[in-house]
Amino acid sequence: MTNSNNDFVGVLEADLNGQDLRIGIVQARFNEEHCVALSTACITELLALGVTQADIKLVTVPGALEIPFALQKLAATGEFDGLVALGAVIRGETYHFELVSNESAAGITRISIDSGLPIANGVLTCETDEQASVRVNLKGADCAKAVVEMANLALALTPDFDIEVNAGEE
């Protein structure tokens, strides 16, 4: 009989309950048709997971390279449990596609690590409009699930210093 590691250690299970979570979304407007579809799918799934409409804030920016700046500003407010980055970068005839894709992803990751705030990266990088159209609904919903799960994980792994500091004090 084999045992998995789960038999011997405490496991934090994925928590997709969005109740009481505050989620910020930064959506690029470049390739707007795809970006609006991404945000619509994301918001629809957030609502289905229990995040209230009042607890969702949507900010739009010109393009994918502007997403990290807006994420950083939202993270700095301390008002959010998680953030979502949404955009669509579609290959053209120049090297610009690689630059935008790589720099946007690096900036999103850096903001998440530096702020300690989970950020679901839903910036599509596709070869064609058709590829983007096929992916937007699933990617938007996946980002909603990812940000809710990671926000709950972050909350579960964050010590409650007030309780520890004030324990035993009257």
Curated annotation (Swiss-Prot):
5-amino-6-(D-ribitylamino)uracil binds at residues 30, 64-66, 88-90, 121. GO terms for molecular function: 6,7-dimethyl-8-ribityllumazine synthase activity. CDD domains: Lumazine_synthase-I (cd09209). One of its GO terms (biological process) is riboflavin biosynthetic process. SUPFAM superfamilies: Lumazine synthase. The active site is at 96 (proton donor). Pathway: Cofactor biosynthesis; riboflavin biosynthesis; riboflavin from 2-hydroxy-3-oxobutyl phosphate and 5-amino-6-(D-ribitylamino)uracil: step 1/2. InterPro entries: LS, LS/RS, LS/RS_sf. It catalyses: (2S)-2-hydroxy-3-oxobutyl phosphate + 5-amino-6-(D-ribitylamino)uracil = 6,7-dimethyl-8-(1-D-ribityl)lumazine + phosphate + 2 H2O + H(+). Keywords: Riboflavin biosynthesis, Transferase. Its EC number is 2.5.1.78. GO terms for cellular component: cytosol; riboflavin synthase complex. It comes from the Bacteria. Gene3D superfamilies: Lumazine/riboflavin synthase. (2S)-2-hydroxy-3-oxobutyl phosphate binds at residues 93-94, 135. It holds the Pfam family DMRL_synthase. Belongs to the DMRL synthase family. NCBIfam families: lumazine-synth. Catalyzes the formation of 6,7-dimethyl-8-ribityllumazine by condensation of 5-amino-6-(D-ribitylamino)uracil with 3,4-dihydroxy-2-butanone 4-phosphate. This is the penultimate step in the biosynthesis of riboflavin. HAMAP family: Lumazine_synth. This is 6,7-dimethyl-8-ribityllumazine synthase. The gene is ribH.
